[in-house]
């Protein structure tokens, strides 16, 4: 049997609700084109028979485009008209009388295959006589009774593979197996150029075009479930390192730290914070100058020389920025001493001196007034500064926000200039949508290979594979281990063998090792029972 390979590339298998699996033309097929020849005298390919069996016979009122004609022991199939794209292939059986009425010369040109188109005999598979008889019986059944109805059982003895010696108990098993030997893929997807040898694989592929496999994090379409499983850990790990803007999105109601893009506004906010470190400005004079320029440039800000008289010239004096502890004022000391004296007099008894009580109350009022006037006035809160229009109008600098995420290596004696930012963000960290990384197992990620571990202990042990650290050293030899269990196994199998001879020298060595490791929680040294009995001692020879 031979089948035209160009014809196979011009058709595809589709599922029809009324007719089941049918052949549809994907390219235009010319008139008089020979599709295939079935010859009983030569071995025939069962895969080709299954493909040709998909050509349904035309019903009454339907126009057939494929004609089938039989001559001697050969059956020829050819196109009887031009088949357009999307047209279903329909078969018409011609009797010998109808064939005789036609021009024999034209039929020979349209039906007979050329010698160069016929398959090489060396490519055909050699089969036994029983296989030939079974296959010929299948061909005879198709020729006499027509196509197989879905669910119809072929005749007995026809479920054997024509290429290999395998046999099957059902026609569906033989049909599914036959695609293994066929290099062609008749089941093609109508949305993409992919094709498959089995219809079940095509049905599974159609899920990509219907719902598909979508990543819930980045909404990306994956071609298969395996690709989605491989993509999700990488995508979820990338989501942990989003910019600071996404982490502070929940703070937009209170002014939002996301609207603070540049250093001048950061310094302006910092100076109005209650615990801003003056030592930072003393060590960074350029930052102080930049802060002063920004404060004077803003229309609502008040400069130090703004309240001066217009007639008197403004003079700039150097400001002492050294952070020195402020001594307590005399009024506060007097208030404290007088309050203590008043408590002593009240403990002795009521002396009836109302004037002293009034004088003490007056001193307290004066001291509290003096203390309140000496405090630095704060006219704006941090939330008001963050909500300023000039701060929200500027663009976000992702580089600066990334720098805020990293820990700055400042002197421990000097407080960090960004401590107030961390304090504010920590106050509402629970309201931030990205403050929690989803599940606890995604928090510990290796910085070398990006692996994720559920516990910090697992990550610490994994990091030693990259750094080569071996903190667990053997007490007997010079070997070191990265895992404590490996050290314990080494000591148990190498140094503490059960057949070791017990000598006074070994007793002395084990006792000294026991004293040196008595504070540890895990003891890997094996001791002799005499060392643990009260009142017993092992004689140790003098060296």
UniProtKB/Swiss-Prot annotation:
Keyword Transferase: no
Organism: Caenorhabditis elegans
Biased composition, class Low complexity, residue ranges: 513-533
Function recorded in the entry: Probable transcription factor, required for migration of the hermaphrodite-specific motor neurons (HSNs) from the tail to the gonad primordium during HSN cell differentiation. Required for phasmid neuron development. Required to specify the pi-cell fate of ventral uterine precursor cell (VU) cells.
Pfam family, any one: zf-C2H2
Zinc finger (C2H2-type): 159-181, 187-209, 213-233, 444-466, 472-495
Entry comment, domain topic: The positive regulatory (PR) domain is required for egl-43 protein stability but is dispensable for anchor cell (AC) invasion and preventing AC proliferation.
Gene knockout outcome: RNAi-mediated knockdown causes defects in anchor cell (AC) and ventral uterine (VU) precursor cell specification and AC invasion in the larval L3 and L4 stages. RNAi-mediated knockdown on a lin-12 mutant background reverses the AC-deficient phenotype. RNAi-mediated knockdown reduces expression of zmp-1, cdh-3 and him-4 in the AC. RNAi-mediated knockdown reduces expression of fos-1a in the anchor cell (AC) approximately three-fold. RNAi-mediated knockdown causes defects in vulval morphogenesis.
Biological-process GO terms, alphabetical: negative regulation of transcription by RNA polymerase II; nervous system development; positive regulation of transcription by RNA polymerase II; regulation of cell fate specification; regulation of cell migration; regulation of DNA-templated transcription; regulation of mitotic cell cycle; regulation of neuron differentiation
Native organism taxonomy: Eukaryota, Metazoa, Ecdysozoa, Nematoda, Chromadorea
Region (Disordered): 299-380, 496-543
Name assigned to this protein: Zinc finger protein egl-43
Gene: egl-43
